[in-house]
């Protein structure tokens, strides 16, 4: 009978795990074709490959958002698919000028999304007000209403820029797991 690596011989006290034991066990299992990981890492991997996004197209940036779904860019090859309901989506792309009257609707839609939820701010108007920055009716950046994870600059940003922003979000999720707010 072999002793467990977590229990010491004296008084049966629990000690720190023996790293060499786990390394040898991991090497033995890997040789047989198995994958050893934690459930959190598995969920994190699945989350990066199945981002469902919801459009919040407010102005001309929404046209560029449509382009990434066409065959030339085909955002679905990265596991990103559009959804019409906020309850089914975990990424919201805010594209265009956000007015004061639209801000409560943006917050309401954001609150209806399931956790974990991410926001991509697309274009100069969504990032900071854009050309309409000094207007009385414009919110100077959607980050004043909802927390933003990725900013895509440009007026309007190209479809390649949005695609790059989605890939940056996937890297951010892979690197940090769920993003705590």
UniProtKB/Swiss-Prot annotation:
EC identifiers of the protein: 7.1.1.-
UniProt GO molecular function: 4 iron, 4 sulfur cluster binding; iron ion binding; NADH dehydrogenase (ubiquinone) activity; NADH:ubiquinone reductase (non-electrogenic) activity; quinone binding
GO BP term (any one): electron transport coupled proton transport
The protein's required cofactors: [4Fe-4S] cluster
Top EC group: translocase
Recorded superkingdom: Bacteria
Gene Ontology CC: plasma membrane; respiratory chain complex I
SUPFAM superfamilies for this protein: HydA/Nqo6-like (SSF56770)
UniProt signal peptide: none
Name this polypeptide is given: NADH-quinone oxidoreductase subunit B
Function: NDH-1 shuttles electrons from NADH, via FMN and iron-sulfur (Fe-S) centers, to quinones in the respiratory chain. Couples the redox reaction to proton translocation (for every two electrons transferred, four hydrogen ions are translocated across the cytoplasmic membrane), and thus conserves the redox energy in a proton gradient.
Primary site of residence: membrane
HAMAP family, alphabetized: NDH1_NuoB
Family: Belongs to the complex I 20 kDa subunit family.
Record: residues binding [4Fe-4S] cluster: 60-61, 125, 155
Entry's cofactor comment: Binds 1 [4Fe-4S] cluster.
Quaternary data: NDH-1 is composed of 14 different subunits. Subunits NuoB, C, D, E, F, and G constitute the peripheral sector of the complex.
Localization annotation: Cell inner membrane
Reaction(s) catalysed by this chain's protein: a quinone + NADH + 5 H(+)(in) = a quinol + NAD(+) + 4 H(+)(out)
Record's keyword annotation contains Iron: yes
Keywords, sorted A to Z: 4Fe-4S, Cell inner membrane, Cell membrane, Iron, Iron-sulfur, Membrane, Metal-binding, NAD, Quinone, Translocase, Transport, Ubiquinone
Membrane disposition: Peripheral membrane protein
PANTHER family (UniProt xref): NADH DEHYDROGENASE, NADH DEHYDROGENASE [UBIQUINONE] IRON-SULFUR PROTEIN 7, MITOCHONDRIAL
Pfam families linked: Oxidored_q6
The keyword Membrane is annotated on this UniProt entry: yes
């Amino acid at each position: 009978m072999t002793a467990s690596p977590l229990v010491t011989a004296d008084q049966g006290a629990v000690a720190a795990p023996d790293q060499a034991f786990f390394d040898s066990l991991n090497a033995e299992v890997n040789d047989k074709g198995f994958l050893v990981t934690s459930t959190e890492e598995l969920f994190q991997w699945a989350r990066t490959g199945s981002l469902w996004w919801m459009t919040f197209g407010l102005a001309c940036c929404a046209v560029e958002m449509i382009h990434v779904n066409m065959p030339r860019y085909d955002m679905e090859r990265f596991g990103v698919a559009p959804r019409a309901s906020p309850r089914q989506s975990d990424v919201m792309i805010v594209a265009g000028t956000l007015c004061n009257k639209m801000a409560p609707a943006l917050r309401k839609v954001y609150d209806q999304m399931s956790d974990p939820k991410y926001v991509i701010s697309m274009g100069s108007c969504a990032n900071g007000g854009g050309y309409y920055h000094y207007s009385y009716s414009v919110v100077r950046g959607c980050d004043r209403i909802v927390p933003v994870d990725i900013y895509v600059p440009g007026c309007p940003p190209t479809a390649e820029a949005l695609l790059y922003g989605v890939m940056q979000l996937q890297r951010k999720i892979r690197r940090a797991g769920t993003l705590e707010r």
